[in-house]
Regions:
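Active-site activation/catalytic loop segments of kinase-like enzymes and analogous catalytic loops
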Residues: 153-190, 205-223
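An alpha-helical support segment within catalytic cores of ATP-dependent transferases
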Residues: 69, 81-124, 134
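Structured catalytic core of nucleotide-sugar glycosyltransferases
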Residues: 7, 11-15, 21-24, 81-85, ...
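ATP/Mg2+ or Mg2+-diphosphate-binding catalytic cores
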Residues: 211-254
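ATP-binding pocket architecture of kinase catalytic cores
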Residues: 1-69
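A glycine-centered beta->alpha junction motif in the catalytic cores
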Residues: 31-44, 85-89, 209-225
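Active-site acidic catalytic loop and adjacent metal/ATP-binding pocket
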Residues: 14-15, 107-154
Length: 254
């Protein structure tokens, strides 16, 4: 966030303490103070807003490609098998076929996952509640807790899942107009490569599985009187089905 701010990207700016550190301690806990970001999130983005978001994502990627530091993605494809092993025996309580659905998707994803695509620091959690607008103009991204090094195309795949599906969980449908506008905005700043286009299907399938698995884990391990609202894992079953049936990158745009 410090480096993004230095490069003119709009996000909360960390404020240094008296020792010129950004991370401080209070009662054995770490905390950071950041600048206030004007604006608020929208629950459902329009196609034109998706284009703006795509443009800003590409701007962010163009900035982060020059960063000298790295941060591992602790929720990358390498972690999903381990998460599944912790919920495999209980997730049928959520949906009877969930164990077999996860296993089938995970096996194919592990087999087809790309090994070498353009990469750098990504946000990795760009849901609509982390995207701010003010007076119908983009005003910044927030919540960089999950930011890490990964494929830039994986960020796009996450956004396809987070921003481009409409409807309730029983009848979710992929909004190709939103996806097309997202990519139009992105390609204005950074054109994705042929290899990234080829990989977008499995990356999107993987992004859906990643959020399904963490939601299943949270659902199973929630405690009584939990303050945080547990999100519905089943919202990702239709997403997985769509990605599994997609044939190519073009299926996301037409």
């Amino acid at each position: 966030m410090v480096e993004l701010s230095k490069n003119g990207f709009v996000c909360p700016k960390p404020i240094a303490n008296k020792d010129n550190n950004y991370i401080s301690d209070f009662n054995d806990k770490k905390f950071m103070i950041v600048s206030f970001l004007d604006g608020k999130s929208k629950s459902n983005l329009s196609p034109s807003e998706c284009k703006i978001v795509g443009n800003q994502i590409a701007r962010m990627h163009q900035i982060t490609k020059n960063f000298k530091f790295t941060r591992n993605n602790d929720l990358s494809v390498r972690s999903w098998r381990g998460i599944f092993s912790q919920v495999k025996d209980k997730c049928n309580k959520i949906h009877a076929e969930l164990p077999s659905l996860i296993e089938a998707n995970l096996s194919s994803i592990e087999k087809e996952w790309p090994k070498n695509l353009p990469s750098g620091i990504i946000h990795a959690d760009l849901f609509s509640d982390n995207i701010f607008f003010k007076n119908n103009k983009f005003s910044g991204f927030i919540d960089f807790y999950f930011s890490c090094n990964d494929f830039y195309a994986f960020e796009i795949a996450i956004c396809f899942n987070a921003l481009c599906f409409d409807g309730l969980k029983q009848n979710l449908s992929f909004n190709v107009t939103k996806a097309k506008k997202l990519m139009e905005g992105y390609n204005e700043v950074r054109k994705i490569s042929k290899d990234e286009k080829v990989a977008i299907k499995v990356l999107s399938q993987g992004a859906a599985l990643r959020f399904l698995l963490t939601r299943v884990f949270d659902y199973i391990n929630t405690v009584d009187n939990a303050v945080v609202k547990i999100k519905d894992p089943e919202e990702y079953l239709k997403r997985l089905e769509f990605h599994k049936n997609a044939k190519s990158f073009e299926d996301y745009l037409i």
